[in-house]
């Protein structure tokens, strides 16, 4: 849900904060919407714990309907550090959130409380000493080259009115290694077919240019032939991917599309694969199949730290075997042995 279309459902101070990070701090709109959702979950939790009798028969559907308009600054003043820890425990047990997801939600409310204290709307920041959970470094799931081709083949050969759009989406994920928010945010003006380039707005509103291969460029051009035309007065006029309602496609929409495409290609055998897995797949294939330099992959992915890129570069056992067999020391020993035989 967009924070812009929900302002009448929010307390004024929350709207001020969301506008501040969007228009002053220049966060991407998709990032602000994610932060808004994180804060909204926390506000609903506050209301639920304050009115335990009203919400004793807890259901997820009931939780989603809790209005946050009446969360006052006085209620926020009552928030203590132990309540933040209890909230994180709630996220873990009730929402089954991973450490990574809990940390993201904690980061959202930490920054919110920091702003509230900095602007003198609150006298105390209860999150200041709350620590982030330790995240186990697990290798993300990914598809093989053959499986990637199978996914694209099944997607383009599906009889659906959105087949061409869906194919372009999956093609971009696998070839350009984009984050979900980056794909959703692509505008028509970001694409230059004559230069085969795509301008991406990534985390922290940072922009980067990536190059399109022929397959990806063709998939986008084919989609543009069937993409609905919007009037220039429409706020989504410039959006590349549109939903059936002729609005900029949402993150959830893309997730559902990818889930359906994966199901068609693999039934339920790839139920652990999601949109971020496709980004990971693209980076892994670049490294293993095309021998792409890790520094190049870092630029394509938009990572600031090389350590963030390293998790995307699986080296297969076969590849490792080839490297070890072809290592410099091995070849020197072989040459030496060969020369000794010649002398004999």
Go through the PLM ranges and name each one.
Residues 1-344:
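Conserved catalytic core of the tyrosine transesterase superfamily
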């Amino acid at each position: 849900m967009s924070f812009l279309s929900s302002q009448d459902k929010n307390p004024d101070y929350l709207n001020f904060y969301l506008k501040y990070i969007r228009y002053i701090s220049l966060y991407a709109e998709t990032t602000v919407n994610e932060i808004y959702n994180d804060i909204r979950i926390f506000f609903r939790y506050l209301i639920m714990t304050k009115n335990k009798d009203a919400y004793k028969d807890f259901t997820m559907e009931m939780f989603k309907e809790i209005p946050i308009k009446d969360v006052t600054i006085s209620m926020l003043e009552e928030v203590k550090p132990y309540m933040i820890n209890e909230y994180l425990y709630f996220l873990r047990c009730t929402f089954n959130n991973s450490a990574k997801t809990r940390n993201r939600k904690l980061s959202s409310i930490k920054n919110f409380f920091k702003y509230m204290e900095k602007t003198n709307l609150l006298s105390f920041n209860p999150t200041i000493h709350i620590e982030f959970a330790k995240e186990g470094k697990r290798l993300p799931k990914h598809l093989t080259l053959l499986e990637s081709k199978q996914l694209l083949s099944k997607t383009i050969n599906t009889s659906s009115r959105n087949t061409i759009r869906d194919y372009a989406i999956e093609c971009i994920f696998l070839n350009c290694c984009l984050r979900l928010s980056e794909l959703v945010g692509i505008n028509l003006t970001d694409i230059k077919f004559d230069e085969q380039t795509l301008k991406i707005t990534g985390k922290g509103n940072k922009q980067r240019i990536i190059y399109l291969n022929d397959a990806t460029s063709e998939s986008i051009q084919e989609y543009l032939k069937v993409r609905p035309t919007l009037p220039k007065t429409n706020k989504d006029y410039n959006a590349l991917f549109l939903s059936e309602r002729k609005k900029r496609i949402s993150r959830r929409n893309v997730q559902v599309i990818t889930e359906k495409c994966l199901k068609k290609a693999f039934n339920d055998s790839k139920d652990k694969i999601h949109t971020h897995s496709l980004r990971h797949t693209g980076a892994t294939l670049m490294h293993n199949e095309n021998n792409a330099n890790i520094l190049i992959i870092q630029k394509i992915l938009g990572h600031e730290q090389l350590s963030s890129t390293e998790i995307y570069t699986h080296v297969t056992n076969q590849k490792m075997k080839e490297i070890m067999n072809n290592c410099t020391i091995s070849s020197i020993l072989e040459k030496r042995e060969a020369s000794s035989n010649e002398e004999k």
